[in-house]
Each structure stands twice: as structure tokens, then as C-alpha cells.
């Protein structure tokens, strides 16, 4: 099977990490990138050097207005309007929408004007169908032109919640994600009219924040709709986050039994999405981990057989970006079978 030709709109954190992952992905070839705010030489620099993930494993060069990565030309566009990007010139049939701006179906559909067939939004969407690998990707039937890969936190939480709900039944639960700071936060205190706490210096503070990640699980696992909610605590680390899921379960089980159930799922149907560790790990040990969710056996606790706290790590950049591409490859496979 020939590689799936992909375009990336938005060359920020996720756009660049998706590109890096694509180089390692056997089914994907990035043939075009669009970003109106940077020129090609700067795009090459940002792809080559990364403070969290290190030096790019390969060759990055510039040829006129285009990138050349590992000897292959990657067309570089600088269009502000997605409808003006000529994806068809490069053969890009699938577009990763990673600007964080065009997150509705109507806005993301603009990519179809330039020749794209499908758009995968690398963020939650208010109206596009959301899919999480290992959870509900089998629901994709090829009919939607625009889909969402949900958020990095939902990708961590949903596989874990699925295993617990399938085996024990979740009555209700609360989630907290202890989340690294992101590009939307401030390096020092600055104006943030909609979120006053969010305007405080990211590297100086622990900042309580909101997240829709837990409620979004109800969209990908309808049986959990209304049973989960959560919050975020932004902390002074640049990458890697951790989910704390506290649930009341219907079918009583010891923490050890629950652990064995999670391990069985991680070694079986959810391999590559859900993983586990019994080591005394810290956040930096998870840097570059390609799994969506890494269950920390030693970090969790239970109060009794029906009330348990589970802890799971995720590289909110690398693991999530790999899932974007895995979902894209799955979508392309389903589309090809139609």
C-alpha cells in the first residue's frame, strides 16, 4: 500500500510533533505544510530543534520556498484562509488541522475546497464527530468529511475509563489532570480577561483550570455520558501530564484485581494505546512515549472495593500526535474499502 499523502495546517507544537511522528509512521507521508505566520527557513529551524524532544532524527533543508525532509520535498504554503491552500497540487488527500482555530465542521471543511478529501482536527470540536483510538474508532463509517481526534487528556482518560467500565461498571467519577503548561499560557503575569488565573506566570505557579476532557469521554463512550467530569491543574513543567481518575464502581474489586484487568487490556486489545508500569517513574520518564495512556500501578490507591483512584501518564504532545496519525491511517483504510 502506498503511503497516505498528508497535509498539515498549522506548524505549532502539535503540527511539528505530528510531522516528527509522521517520519516514523510507515503508512504516512507529509507532502505539504501551511502556516501563514512563519517563513520556510524558520519552519525548518523549528522542525530541526525542539527543547522538549531534542534534535530531529533526520535531515531538514530548504529549497526555495519549500522544505526538504530526508530528501523528499514538502510544499510549504503561507495561506491565511484554508480554502486558498492548494492541497491537490501535492496530492494531499488528508489534512491534519492543527491551528487550534478551525475546530468546527464548517471552518475545517474549507480545506476541501483546495482538494483535501478528509480533515482530522487535532483538538476537541463542538460539532465534528470525535474518535479516540482504542475506544470508538470502529464507529467511523466514512460518511464524515471532518472528524476530531479529541484532546490529549481525553485520549489518556478514555481507554482507561473504557476498561474499568467494561469490567466493573462506573457509577460516577471525577478526573483531575495535572497538566504541563502549554503555548496559550503566559511566561510572566499578563492579561487574560476570560481566565484570570490563566494569565499568571506558567513557570511560577500551580494554576487550577477547566477542562472538557472528562465530559468528552461521554461522547466517545455514551454509557458514561453524565457520569464523569473533571478539572485541570496546570503545573510548571514543559511536557508530560498525568490523569488522576477517581471512580465509584458497581462490581466490587480489589486494587490488585483492577490492576490485573488493566494489564490484560494493555497487553491485548489496547496494546499501543494503553500501557502500564510498575516502576517508580516521574514525568520526565514518559517523554516521547507513544502510548495514549500509561497506567502507573504504584501510584493508585483504593478506599474499598467500590471506590478507587487510578493514575495514568501521557506525553501530551508526542503520544497524542501519534494517535492523530493512527486515526488518520484508520480513516484512510476505511475510506479505501468503500
Curated annotation (Swiss-Prot):
Its activity is regulated as follows: Inhibited by koningic acid through the interaction of cysteine residues with koningic acid even at very low concentrations.
Which pathway, per its entry? Carbohydrate degradation; glycolysis; pyruvate from D-glyceraldehyde 3-phosphate: step 1/5
Question: Which GO biological process entries does UniProt record here?
Answer: glucose metabolic process; glycolytic process
Localisation: Cytoplasm
Tell me where it mainly resides.
cytoplasm
* Catalysed reactions listed for this entry: D-glyceraldehyde 3-phosphate + phosphate + NAD(+) = (2R)-3-phospho-glyceroyl phosphate + NADH + H(+)
Enzyme Commission identifier(s): 1.2.1.12
A GO CC annotation recorded here is: cytosol
Residue sites binding NAD(+) per the record:
13-14, 35, 80, 316
EC top class, in one word? oxidoreductase
Residues carrying the site annotation Activates thiol group during catalysis: 179
Asked if the Swiss-Prot or TrEMBL record annotates the protein with the keyword NAD, the reply is yes
Record-listed D-glyceraldehyde 3-phosphate binding positions = 151-153, 182, 211-212, 234
Q: Which domain of life is it from?
A: Eukaryota
* Active-site residues (renumbered): 152 (nucleophile)
What GO molecular function terms would the record report? glyceraldehyde-3-phosphate dehydrogenase (NAD+) (phosphorylating) activity; NAD binding; NADP binding
Which family, according to UniProt?
Belongs to the glyceraldehyde-3-phosphate dehydrogenase family.
* Assembly and interaction partners: Homotetramer.
Against NCBIfam families, the record matches this protein to: GAPDH-I
What protein is this chain from?
Glyceraldehyde-3-phosphate dehydrogenase 2
Amino acid at each position: 500500500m502506498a503511503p497516505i499523502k498528508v497535509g498539515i495546517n498549522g506548524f505549532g507544537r502539535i503540527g511539528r510533533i505530528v510531522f516528527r511522528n509522521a517520519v516514523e509512521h510507515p503508512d504516512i507521508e507529509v507532502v505539504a505544510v501551511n502556516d501563514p505566520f512563519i517563513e520556510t527557513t524558520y519552519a525548518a529551524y523549528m522542525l530541526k530543534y525542539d527543547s522538549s524532544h531534542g534534535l530531529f532524527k533526520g535531515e531538514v533543508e530548504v529549497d526555495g520556498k519549500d522544505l526538504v525532509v530526508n530528501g523528499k520535498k514538502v510544499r510549504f504554503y503561507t495561506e491565511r484562509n484554508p480554502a486558498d491552500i492548494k492541497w491537490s497540487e501535492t496530492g494531499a488527500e488528508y489534512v491534519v488541522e492543527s491551528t487550534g482555530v478551525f475546530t468546527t465542521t464548517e471552518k475545517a471543511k474549507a480545506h476541501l475546497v483546495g482538494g483535501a478529501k478528509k480533515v482530522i482536527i487535532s483538538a476537541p470540536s463542538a460539532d465534528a464527530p470525535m474518535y479516540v483510538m482504542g475506544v470508538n474508532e470502529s464507529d467511523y463509517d466514512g460518511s464524515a468529511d471532518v472528524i476530531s481526534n479529541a484532546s490529549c487528556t481525553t485520549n489518556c482518560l478514555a481507554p482507561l475509563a473504557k476498561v474499568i467500565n467494561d469490567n466493573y461498571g462506573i457509577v460516577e467519577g471525577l478526573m483531575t489532570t495535572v497538566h504541563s503548561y502549554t503555548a496559550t499560557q503566559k511566561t510572566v503575569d499578563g492579561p487574560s480577561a476570560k481566565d484570570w488565573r490563566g494569565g499568571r506566570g506558567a513557570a511560577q505557579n500551580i494554576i487550577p483550570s477547566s477542562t472538557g476532557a472528562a465530559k468528552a469521554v461521554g461522547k466517545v463512550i455514551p454509557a458514561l455520558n453524565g457520569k464523569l467530569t473533571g478539572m485541570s491543574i496546570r503545573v510548571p513543567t514543559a511536557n508530560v501530564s498525568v490523569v488522576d481518575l477517581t471512580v465509584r464502581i458497581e462490581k466490587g474489586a480489589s486494587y490488585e484485581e483492577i490492576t490485573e484487568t488493566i494489564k490484560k487490556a494493555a497487553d491485548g486489545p489496547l496494546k499501543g494505546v494503553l500501557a502500564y508500569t510498575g516502576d517508580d517513574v516521574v514525568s520526565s520518564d514518559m517523554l516521547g512515549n507513544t502510548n495514549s495512556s500509561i497506567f502507573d500501578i504504584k501510584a493508585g490507591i483504593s478506599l474499598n472495593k467500590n471506590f478507587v483512584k487510578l493514575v495514568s501518564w501521557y506525553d501530551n504532545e508526542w503520544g497524542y500526535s501519534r494517535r492523530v496519525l493512527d486515526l488518520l491511517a484508520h480513516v484512510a483504510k476505511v475510506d479505501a474499502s468503500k
